From Swiss-Prot:
Designated name of the protein: Cytochrome P450 4c3
Keywords from the named record: Endoplasmic reticulum, Heme, Iron, Membrane, Metal-binding, Microsome, Monooxygenase, Oxidoreductase
Taxonomic source organism: Drosophila melanogaster
Keyword Heme: yes
Cited Pfam families: p450 (PF00067)
Binding site for heme: E342, C481
Alphabetical list of InterPro entries matching this protein: Cyt_P450 (IPR001128), Cyt_P450_CS (IPR017972), Cyt_P450_E_grp-I (IPR002401), Cyt_P450_sf (IPR036396), Cytochrome_P450_Monoox (IPR050196)
Length: 535
C-alpha cells in the first residue's frame, strides 16, 4: 500500500474521530435534527440549482439575488400592468415565452397559442397558482380555488347547473334587471359625460345574486347596502394583497388595519350566504312536506299568486345534496360565493367595454341596432326570449371582439406540477405559468390589425382554421369557465336592452385610458360616455 493511500486513510480516520467526538457531545435527538436539516439543505440546493438552470435559459430581464425583478416591479399600481406587458414585448416576442423572478419564485409568461396550449390543455396543470390563495377566506375550496380531485368532483356536480334548459329559467332575471338599468340611466340623458362602469356593475350584481341565491339585494337601488359594500371591499383587499409582497404573509397581513376590514367583510358575506341557505332549505322542506301531504310527488312549481317559480343556482346545489352527493352547508356556500364572485365583475367589465367600444364606433353600433330592429321591430319594451338572444349574432361578434381587446381576466395563473417543454424550453416543476390573455389576443398572425375593434373577426368565415388557443376569454381546456354560456346570454340581454332605448357615444378616447390589470381588467378612471334616447 502506498504512503499516499496510508496518509489519506489516516486523515479520514482522524476526521471521523473528530466528528465522532463532536457528535458525542449532543443528544441523539439533536444529532437527528441536525442531520435532517443538513439532508434537507442538500436536497433543496440540488433541486433549486436545477430549477434556476432551466429558468435562466428562458429569455427575461436580469434578476438580483433574493429580490429577483422586484425593483422593476416596484412601480405604481396603474403602471404595473404596462410594465409586465412591456417585458413580454421586449423579451418574449420570438418564442412566445419569457420569465421573471418574484423574489426567489420564478414565473413564466406565455402569450402565443402554441405556448399556452401545453398548460391549459393538460389535466396535469389544472391547479391554480398561489395568487388565488387570497380568495380562500371568502370562497373556500369552491370551483375556482379547489385543486385536483376536489375540483374534478365539484366540476362534475356543477356542470348540469349550466345546462341550456336551466339557463332559460334565468332569462327573466336578465330582462328585469336590465330594465332597471335602463331606467337608472335615464337620469344621465342630457349629461355631457358619465362613468358607465358603476351602473353596469350594480346591474350584474343584482343579476348574479338573484340567479345564484334566488334573493334580490336591490343593488341598483341601494348601492350602500352592507352586502354590496362587502363585495366591493373584499375584492379591493384581495387585489392589494396580490400587488404588495409584504401583505402576502398572513402574519403581517393580520397586523394591518386592512385585516380587520377583511374579517368584517367576510363575516357579512358568509353571514348573508348562510342565512339564505338556511332559509331556502327550510322553504324546500315545507314544500316537500306539503307535496307529501297532498300525495303529490311533483314539485310545487308555482307560488301563491300562480306565478312560475324560478330555480336558483342554490336550489340546484341543494337538490344535488339530496340525491346522494355529499355537499355540506359549507360546500354549498363555497360554490354560491364563487358564483357570486366570478359572475358579476367579469360580466360587468365585458358589458361596459362592449358598450364603450360601440360608442367609439357608431358604424358597428348601427349594425347591432339594425339586427335588434329585425328581431323586435319598433318595440322597445318587450323582453327578449332565449330565441331572441340566440338570434343576436352580430351583437355576439361585437361582444367577442370586445373580449379580445379587453378580456375580463387579463392574466391567468397555473402551477406547473412537473417539467414541461414549452416553446423548446424546459419549464421545471414548481414554476408559476402566467397566461397573458391580453397579449395573446393581440397576435397579428391571428388577428390582422390587432389593436383595431373589428367584430368581423368573429364572423364564421373568419374563425375557420383559427388556432383553438388563440382566443381564450373564458380560458380553455379542461378548466375553462363553466359559466361562459350564462355570461354571453346575460351580456346580450343587458346590452340589447340599453341599445334599444339609447344611442351611446364614447367621450373618452381609447388611447387616453389607463388600464388596471388586476383580477379584472378595468379602466383606472372609468369609461365616460353620453347617451341620447332613440326615437
Amino acid at each position: 500500500m502506498s504512503s499516499k493511500v496510508i496518509t489519506s486513510l489516516m486523515a479520514e480516520s482522524i476526521l471521523l474521530s473528530k466528528v465522532g467526538q463532536v457528535i458525542s457531545g449532543y443528544s441523539p435527538i439533536t444529532v437527528f435534527l441536525l442531520g435532517s436539516i443538513l439532508i434537507f439543505l442538500v436536497v433543496y440546493n440540488k433541486r433549486r440549482s436545477r430549477l434556476v438552470k432551466y429558468i435562466e435559459k428562458i429569455p427575461g430581464p436580469a434578476a438580483m439575488p433574493f429580490l429577483g425583478n422586484a425593483i422593476e416591479m416596484n412601480v405604481d399600481h396603474d403602471e404595473l400592468f404596462n410594465r409586465v406587458i412591456g417585458m413580454q414585448k421586449l423579451w418574449g416576442t420570438r418564442i412566445g415565452i419569457n420569465r421573471v423572478w418574484q423574489g426567489t419564485a420564478p414565473r413564466v409568461l406565455l402569450f402565443e397559442p402554441e405556448t399556452v396550449e401545453p398548460i391549459l390543455n393538460s389535466q396535469k396543470f389544472v391547479n391554480k397558482s398561489h395568487d388565488y390563495d387570497y380568495l380562500h377566506p371568502w370562497l373556500g375550496e369552491g370551483l375556482l380555488t379547489s385543486t385536483d380531485r376536489k375540483w374534478h368532483s365539484r366540476r362534475k356536480i356543477l356542470t348540469p347547473a349550466f345546462h341550456f334548459k336551466i339557463l332559460d329559467d334565468f332569462i327573466d332575471v336578465f330582462n328585469e334587471q336590465s330594465a332597471v338599468l335602463a331606467r337608472k340611466l335615464a337620469v344621465e340623458v342630457g349629461s355631457e359625460a358619465f362613468n358607465l362602469f358603476p351602473y353596469v356593475t350594480l346591474c350584474t350584481l343584482d343579476i348574479v345574486c338573484e340567479t345564484a341565491m334566488g334573493r334580490r339585494i336591490y343593488a341598483q337601488s341601494n348601492s350602500e347596502s352592507e352586502y354590496v359594500k362587502a363585495v366591493y371591499g373584499i375584492g379591493s383587499i384581495v387585489q392589494s394583497r396580490q400587488a404588495k409582497i409584504w401583505l402576502q404573509s398572513d402574519f403581517i397581513f393580520s397586523l394591518t388595519a386592512e385585516y380587520k376590514l377583511h374579517q368584517s367583510y367576510i363575516n357579512t358575506l358568509h353571514g348573508f350566504s348562510n342565512m339564505v341557505i338556511r332559509e331556502r332549505k327550510a322553504e324546500l322542506a315545507i314544500l316537500q312536506e306539503n307535496n307529501n301531504n297532498n300525495n303529490n310527488n311533483a314539485p310545487d312549481a308555482y307560488d301563491d299568486v300562480g306565478k312560475k317559480k324560478r330555480l336558483a343556482f342554490l336550489d340546484l346545489l341543494i337538490d344535488a345534496s339530496k340525491e346522494g352527493t355529499v355537499l355540506s352547508n359549507e360546500d354549498i356556500r363555497e360554490e354560491v360565493d364563487t358564483f357570486m364572485f366570478e359572475g358579476h365583475d367579469t360580466t360587468s367589465a365585458a358589458i361596459s367595454w362592449t358598450l364603450f367600444l360601440l360608442g367609439c364606433h357608431p358604424e358597428y353600433q348601427e349594425r347591432v341596432v339594425e339586427e335588434l330592429d329585425s328581431i323586435f321591430g319598433d318595440d322597445k319594451e318587450t323582453p327578449a326570449t332565449m330565441k331572441n338572444l340566440m338570434d343576436m349574432r352580430y351583437l355576439e361578434c361585437c361582444i367577442k371582439d370586445s373580449l379580445r381587446l379587453f378580456p375580463s381576466v387579463p392574466m391567468m395563473a397555473r402551477m406547473v406540477g412537473e417539467d414541461v417543454n414549452i416553446g423548446g424550453k424546459i419549464v421545471p416543476a414548481g414554476t408559476q405559468a402566467i397566461i397573458m390573455t391580453y397579449a395573446l389576443h393581440r397576435n397579428p398572425r391571428v388577428f390582422p390589425k390587432p389593436e383595431q375593434f373589428n367584430p368581423d373577426n368573429f364572423l364564421p368565415e373568419n374563425c375557420a382554421g383559427r388556432h383553438p388557443f388563440a382566443y381564450i376569454p373564458f380560458s380553455a381546456g379542461p378548466r375553462n369557465c363553466i359559466g361562459q354560456k350564462f355570461a354571453i346570454l346575460e351580456e346580450k340581454a343587458v346590452i340589447s336592452t340599453v341599445l334599444r332605448k339609447y344611442k351611446i357615444e364614447a367621450v373618452d378616447r381609447r388611447e387616453d385610458l389607463t388600464l388596471l390589470g388586476e383580477l379584472i381588467l378595468r379602466p383606472k378612471d372609468g369609461l365616460r360616455v353620453k347617451i341620447t334616447p332613440r326615437d
